[in-house]
Amino acid sequence: MCRHTSPISLAFAILLTAMAQSGVEGQSARSDRAASTPWAPPRTSDGRPSLEGVWENNSATPLERPAQLANKPRLTDEELASMERRARDLFTPESDAVFGDGLYFALLAQKPASGLGATGTYSQNWLPDRYFEHRTSLIVDPADGKLPPATVEGERARKAAVGTFGRPAASAQEMSIQDRCIHYGFPDLFAAYMSVYRIVQTPDYVAIQMEKIHDTRIIPLDGRPHISSALRQYLGDARGHWEGDTLVVETANFHPNGNPMGGYSTLSDQNLRLVERFKRVAADTLEYTFTVDNPTMWTRPWTAVINWKQSKGELLEYACHEGNYSLRGMLSAARADEAASR
């Protein structure tokens, strides 16, 4: 039996085919436009890029470029994938916790490491996953990915810090401001250890809350000058302004009693002038660039870049305050040890 197609049915079929073809071509054109259109950040009511949200620094990239990678500023795709595989193989949830740069150097050495002296009291299970990047150092200037030489005063400060590390303190004043829960220091380079930030933004101010010791930096954007250099603060005196889509924050007037940057592989004192740049480069990424200008500690300024990732969780309370019961326990235990050794 032969079925005949009516002129109306034939016309309808041709129309459907044309519509389908048009849809495919339209989708292709839209895809091409999407691919060629650069990503644009969400904006606040005053038209500035929104930096708001909870961000974390769990980068595995070390501050300085390791000696084994001295001539390799970036890993290839294959090398990066190999590094990620090694991390999965070498570190399990039961492994001792490894913080900061320790993870990267353990992978290069191809053997586990411990961030707490193999005490077994703190495992990887309690740490967030680290993310790997092609770069082999956070430092981008100097170009070799290394910290510049320290000044004579800087070397003296480094040796003094090493000499006091691990030595029982005679009083609370001899303990670090971190142990005393006064201030942890920033930029926070100790990745994966409560390295989370919350940013809140208005047309006139930006507030950056740090998870450690729940410090909050309140940064005015109205062009006011810095306070008198006679006034020194643990968080320094910050002033911000916008350069295009980048928030620039300049901080000075740091307190002399303590290391503003927390002492993690770095040196800093009250003469530190810190310039930070915050730029949202993707929906889940905030590019954080900072330049350290501290002429009494370093022979030249240096710059590093860290990619903060948007956190899937909230910033939790850091229950730490000066006078914390742990401080009394540490000091009394040290005195008991001294008495027992006499």
What is each PLM-predicted segment?
Residues 2-342:
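PEST-like low-complexity, intrinsically disordered acidic/proline/serine-rich tracts
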